[in-house]
Each structure stands twice: as structure tokens, then as C-alpha cells.
């Protein structure tokens, strides 16, 4: 289970993992108040990518990452619907 030290590396690897098989990929966001740590996991049951942070500025990056994944999901669904109707 590789734990990434930089956000850029993690986000690139997580996006690749999602694009490899969107139906198997999951994203888990976990916050521990006692430690003040935020943990993001992206997995497809074979590979598990982890990024942990205690910096408030990383929350914006994580929010942007989630919206990027949502856009990828919607774009993929829209393509599937148009292919089914044709």
C-alpha cells in the first residue's frame, strides 16, 4: 500500500487508477479529529493508494480532486448513454 508524500504524485496515480477501471475504483476520505489527520484512499481492490495530511491547505486540493473525478464519471456516463441510444 504505497503512501504518497506529495499531493501531485498521489492525484496523478489516483486518476490513472480510476481511468484504468472506473467500475472498480473507490475513493475513501477519512478524518480523525483526535490527530487532526485527513486520509484519502483510492483503491480498486488490487492497488491501494494513500495520502495523509494534517495541512488545512490540502483540503482545497482534495476538494478539487473530487470534483475532477466527478466530472470524469459524468462524462463517461454521458458517453455510455449516447452509445446506448444510437
Curated annotation (Swiss-Prot):
Report the protein's function. Answer: Component of the signal recognition particle (SRP) complex, a ribonucleoprotein complex that mediates the cotranslational targeting of secretory and membrane proteins to the endoplasmic reticulum (ER). SRP9 together with SRP14 and the Alu portion of the SRP RNA, constitutes the elongation arrest domain of SRP. The complex of SRP9 and SRP14 is required for SRP RNA binding.
InterPro entries attached to this UniProt entry:
Signal_recog_particle_SRP9/14, SRP9, SRP9-like, SRP9_dom
Against Gene3D superfamilies, the record matches this protein to: Signal recognition particle alu RNA binding heterodimer, srp9/1
> Highest taxon of the source?
Eukaryota
How it assembles, according to the record, is:
Heterodimer with SRP14; binds RNA as heterodimer. Component of a signal recognition particle complex that consists of a 7SL RNA molecule of 300 nucleotides and six protein subunits: SRP72, SRP68, SRP54, SRP19, SRP14 and SRP9.
Residues bearing N6-acetyllysine are: 52
Biological process (GO) annotations held by this record are:
negative regulation of translational elongation; SRP-dependent cotranslational protein targeting to membrane
Protein name, please? Signal recognition particle 9 kDa protein
GO function term, MF aspect, one = signal recognition particle binding
* Similarity remark: Belongs to the SRP9 family.
List GO terms (cellular component aspect): cytosol; signal recognition particle receptor complex; signal recognition particle, endoplasmic reticulum targeting
Q: Does the keyword RNA-binding apply?
A: yes
Which UniProt keywords are given for this protein, alphabetically ordered? Acetylation, Cytoplasm, Ribonucleoprotein, RNA-binding, Signal recognition particle
Compartments (UniProt record) = Cytoplasm
Amino acid at each position: 500500500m504505497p503512501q504518497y508524500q506529495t499531493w501531485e504524485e498521489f492525484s496523478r496515480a489516483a486518476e490513472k487508477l480510476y481511468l484504468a477501471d472506473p467500475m472498480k475504483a473507490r475513493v475513501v476520505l477519512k478524518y480523525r479529529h483526535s490527530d487532526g489527520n485527513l486520509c484519502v484512499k483510492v483503491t480498486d481492490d488490487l492497488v491501494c493508494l494513500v495520502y495523509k495530511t494534517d495541512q488545512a491547505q490540502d483540503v482545497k486540493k482534495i476538494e478539487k480532486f473530487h470534483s475532477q473525478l466527478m466530472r470524469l464519471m459524468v462524462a463517461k456516463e454521458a458517453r455510455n448513454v449516447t452509445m446506448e441510444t444510437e
